[in-house]
């Protein structure tokens, strides 16, 4: 018994339909795919290209740190969006603008642009984030300064349209100025989170979900996979406990941080704690960064972009400063009481305990690496990692608590020793300091990320910015949630340079504007009513992926287009067809045609000189035709309301119409009718006239008494024309009918065996006798030869002329021969009497 088909099986055919490439979203990771670092993603849809971020990998040097820009033509990029100023998201932007064929526009928020200028300039001076002195920088400081004016700054919650691409930035909560971007291309909404945080901290606004917008594709980070953060209060308490314990044992605390971002949050925490605990105020807190002073100025400038806590603190301190008569207004939320800025280590008196926040956060080079190599040999000191550590960096390595670390900034310091093996370049330093980690990285954890994805409710999720094992765990978790959903969420985690294509089919809706919008739509029609809704025609205009239907006269107002009317004319001459025949042919094809009022001559007698055959030889009529120099209009018709047909006395027909797609097709059809009006059988029959001739014709058709040989000759001619002269030959041996009464041979079963056998010579004689009788029989009925043999290549067929049976071992060839023979019989019939 047949089983019932499932709905999924019935919809399989529709799902397998080919997809138009223009309806596919192409996503390509040039960096940040199954890794953290050098984030760079490409989005292509409907011929538009958006590039997301342009970072460098902190663990690599030179060109190896760049995204795989050679795998994509950057000249096709329309818009480049930078989510925030961190090295792994923005550091290769000067290279893109100065060293590639990129011709698009670059956007970032105002705080990001302000910080980006100083951050990249400092990174170039330090060595372009390279710990290898032999590596050449990928761009210079001058490249950065020259390309900086190309960057355009935008505000949160403002929508901008560039090349039909709509972008809207939203707060991301990661660092000051960090943005999530809503990108709309042809009605497809793509939401890119960048690095984002949903945690309420001391100075940043947490990430928000766009309200009232249906997101089709969500591109989100997966830095921590499904791991969960310790609650914020517990982390702060544990951090301060570790710092105070190191200070109490007489050590120094090194906290490697990015120059901007989490460092400011940690400074707020430390300054608040020091203010509440006077016994620790004797230990100085340093913020060591070349950008320290400039960074604080930027943070003081963009207080309005921070959360309510900072704004409240700013108002309180400004009020206190005003009450105390401080006209300079010093006392804002970023004017710390217990923290000192340290531009470089030359002014640092390394005596006694202290807390040092130093950049860069990955400990690859710079002040943080120099202090690590200086303080690592002492067990009193401690290193506290507060941010995310990228694979391959010293920050990631030291978390494994190795016994030794490689010296980069201080190769000749005391206590260092060279590696065995004679490698003079690598110098090792013993590590005895403590190492602890407390995450203040401002990235969402697994729970927050999953809740955010569920809140967005996008049918397609693309995971980026995460190590492979973390990303795969998050992907598996998201896919497991599909079990309880009717609409399954598609989750992708592409690798670098792995092209991802996702089909998106959307209904195309046109907005009716102008005069056409005044037409009332048809009311609901009951099944018993047969009213036909009115037909609306207009011009369909596409602008920025939006379709509008309007009347041609509204193009200037609603589309900004000027219209031009093109009048087309075509002339042809008919030698035999007159106006009556032309009108009859047009009416037969197009129905009723309209007669134009410009006709100058009466309809009677306007048959045209070419329509009537000159049979009387009247010299006077011939003279009138010869004297007529200017052809006058005989008739004028309007076909299908758009094509004018004018017939003149000299047989010239002129077609005139307004050029457009519909009218051009009708005009082509009219010309096809006119070109065939003189030769079509219907037209010939229409214009024919009855007549009689007095010729003396023989009463008997000369072909009536053709002999069988003549008919055979005609048949052979026809077959030779089809198959070739050498491939057709008569068959002289007839096809014998089956023997009757075959049992007569066995009527004397009791006779001797020798009597039952027939001599071989006797059989041949009997066969020849039967063949001769068959040939005589065929001759009597008028068949000269039994059959015809036809050979083409390795195929052969025999046609028996009595019943026109075709014998061949090739069925297709036999069918072909049978069709040709039947046609030959029709031509030469009757063959045989």
UniProtKB/Swiss-Prot annotation:
EC number(s) per entry: 3.1.27.-
Positions of Zn(2+) 1 binding: 84, 86, 174, 195
Subcellular location: Nucleus
One GO term (biological process): mRNA processing
Presence of keyword RNA-binding: no
GO cellular component terms, semicolon-separated: mRNA cleavage and polyadenylation specificity factor complex
Active site residues according to the UniProt entry: 443 (proton donor)
Family matches, as Gene3D superfamilies: 3.40.50.10890, Ribonuclease Z/Hydroxyacylglutathione hydrolase-like
GO molecular function, one term: 5'-3' RNA exonuclease activity
Binding site for Zn(2+) 2: 88-89, 195, 465
UniProt key word Ribonucleoprotein: no
Alphabetized UniProt keyword annotations: Endonuclease, Hydrolase, Metal-binding, mRNA processing, Nuclease, Nucleus, Zinc
Region (Disordered) location: 600-624, 685-707, 728-767
Biased segments, Basic and acidic residues type: 694-707, 744-759
SMART domains named among the record's database cross-references: Beta-Casp, CPSF73-100_C, Lactamase_B
Family, per entry: Belongs to the metallo-beta-lactamase superfamily. RNA-metabolizing metallo-beta-lactamase-like family. CPSF2/YSH1 subfamily.
Function: Component of the cleavage factor I (CF I) involved in pre-mRNA 3'-end processing.
PANTHER family: CLEAVAGE AND POLYADENYLATION SPECIFICITY FACTOR FAMILY MEMBER (PTHR11203), CLEAVAGE AND POLYADENYLATION SPECIFICITY FACTOR SUBUNIT 3 (PTHR11203:SF11)
Name the UniProt record assigns to this protein: Endoribonuclease YSH1
Organism expressing this protein natively: Gibberella zeae (strain ATCC MYA-4620 / CBS 123657 / FGSC 9075 / NRRL 31084 / PH-1)
Gene label: YSH1
């Amino acid at each position: 018994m047949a089983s019932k088909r499932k709905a999924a099986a019935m919809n399989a055919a529709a799902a397998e339909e080919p997809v138009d490439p223009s309806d596919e979203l192409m996503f390509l990771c040039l960096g940040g795919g199954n890794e953290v670092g050098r984030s760079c993603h490409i989005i292509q849809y409907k011929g538009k290209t958006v590039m997301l971020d342009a970072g460098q990998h902190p663990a690599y040097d030179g060109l190896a740190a760049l995204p795989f820009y050679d795998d994509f033509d950057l000249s096709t990029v329309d818009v480049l969006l930078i989510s925030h100023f961190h090295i792994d998201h923005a550091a290769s932007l000067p290279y893109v603008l100065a060293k590639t064929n990129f011709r698009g526009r670059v956007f970032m928020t105002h705080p990001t642009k302000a910080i980006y200028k100083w951050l990249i300039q400092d990174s170039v001076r330090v060595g372009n984030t390279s710990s290898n002195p032999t590596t050449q920088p990928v761009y210079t400081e001058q490249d950065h300064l020259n390309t900086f004016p190309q960057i355009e700054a935008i505000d949160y919650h403002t929508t901008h349209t560039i090349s039909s691409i709509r972008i809207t930035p939203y707060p991301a909560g990661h660092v000051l100025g960090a943005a999530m971007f809503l990108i709309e291309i042809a009605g497809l909404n793509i939401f890119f989170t960048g690095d984002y945080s949903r945690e309420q901290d001391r100075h940043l606004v947490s990430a928000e979900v766009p309200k009232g917008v249906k997101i089709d594709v969500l591109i989100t980070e997966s830095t921590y996979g499904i791991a969960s953060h310790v609650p914020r209060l517990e982390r702060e308490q544990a951090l301060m406990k570790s710092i105070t314990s190191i200070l109490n044992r007489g050590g120094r605390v090194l906290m490697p941080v990015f120059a901007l971002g989490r460092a400011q949050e940690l400074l707020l925490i430390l300054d608040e704690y020091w203010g509440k605990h006077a016994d620790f105020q004797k230990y100085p807190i340093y913020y060591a960064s070349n950008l320290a002073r400039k960074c604080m100025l930027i943070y003081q400038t963009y207080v309005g972009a921070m959360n309510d806590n900072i704004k409240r603190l700013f108002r309180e301190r400004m009020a206190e400063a005003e009450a105390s008569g401080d006209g300079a207004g010093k006392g804002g939320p970023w004017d710390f009481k217990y923290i000192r800025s340290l531009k470089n280590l030359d002014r640092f008196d390394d005596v006694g305990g202290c807390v040092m926040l130093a950049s860069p956060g990955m400990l690859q080079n710079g002040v943080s690496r120099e202090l690590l190599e200086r303080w690592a040999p002492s067990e009193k000191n401690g290193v506290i990692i507060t941010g995310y550590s990228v694979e391959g960096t010293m920050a990631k390595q030291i978390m494994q608590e190795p016994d030794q670390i490689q010296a980069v900034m201080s190769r000749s310091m005391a206590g260092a020793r060279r590696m065995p093996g004679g490698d003079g370049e690598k110098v090792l330093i013993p590590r005895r300091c403590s190492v602890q980690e407390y995450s203040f990285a401002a990235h969402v954890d697994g729970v927050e990320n999953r809740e955010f994805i569920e809140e967005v409710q996008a049918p397609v999720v693309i995971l980026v910015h995460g190590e492979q094992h973390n990303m795969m765990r998050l992907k598996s978790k998201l896919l497991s949630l599909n079990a309880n959903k009717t609409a399954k969420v598609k989750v992708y985690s592409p690798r670098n340079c792995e092209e991802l294509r996702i089909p998106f089919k959307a209904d195309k809706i046109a907005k009716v504007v102008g005069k056409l919008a005044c037409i009332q739509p048809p009311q609901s029609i009951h099944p018993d009513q047969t009213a036909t809704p009115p037909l609306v025609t207009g011009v369909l205009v596409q602008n920025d992926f939006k379709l509008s239907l309007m009347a041609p006269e509204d193009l200037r107002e609603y589309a900004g287009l000027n219209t031009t009317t093109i009048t087309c004319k075509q002339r042809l001459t008919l030698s035999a067809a007159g106006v009556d025949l032309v009108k009859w042919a047009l009416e037969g094809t197009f129905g009723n045609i309209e007669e134009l009022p410009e006709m100058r001559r009466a309809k009677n007698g306007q048959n045209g000189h070419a329509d009537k055959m000159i049979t009387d030889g009247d010299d006077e009529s011939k003279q009138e035709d010869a004297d007529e120099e200017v052809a006058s209009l005989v008739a004028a018709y309007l076909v299908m309301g758009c094509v004018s047909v004018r017939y003149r006395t000299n047989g010239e027909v002129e077609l005139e119409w307004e050029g457009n797609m519909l009218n051009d097709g009708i005009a082509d059809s009219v010309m096809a009718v006119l070109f065939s009006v003189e030769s079509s059988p219907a037209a010939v029959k229409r214009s024919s006239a009855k007549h009689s001739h007095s010729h003396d014709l023989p009463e008997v058709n000369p072909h009536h008494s053709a002999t069988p040989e003549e008919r055979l000759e005609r048949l052979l001619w026809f077959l030779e024309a089809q198959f070739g002269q050498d491939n057709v030959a008569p068959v002289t041996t007839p096809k014998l009918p089956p023997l009757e009464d075959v049992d007569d041979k066995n009527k004397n079963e009791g006779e001797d065996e020798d009597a039952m056998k027939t001599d071989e010579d006797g059989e041949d004689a009997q066969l020849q006798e039967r063949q001769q009788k068959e040939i005589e029989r065929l001759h009597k009925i008028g068949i000269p030869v039994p059959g015809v043999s036809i050979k083409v290549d390795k195929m052969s067929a025999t046609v028996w002329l009595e019943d026109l049976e075709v014998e061949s071992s090739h069925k297709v060839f036999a069918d072909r021969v049978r069709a040709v023979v039947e046609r030959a019989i029709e031509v030469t019939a009757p063959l045989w009497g």
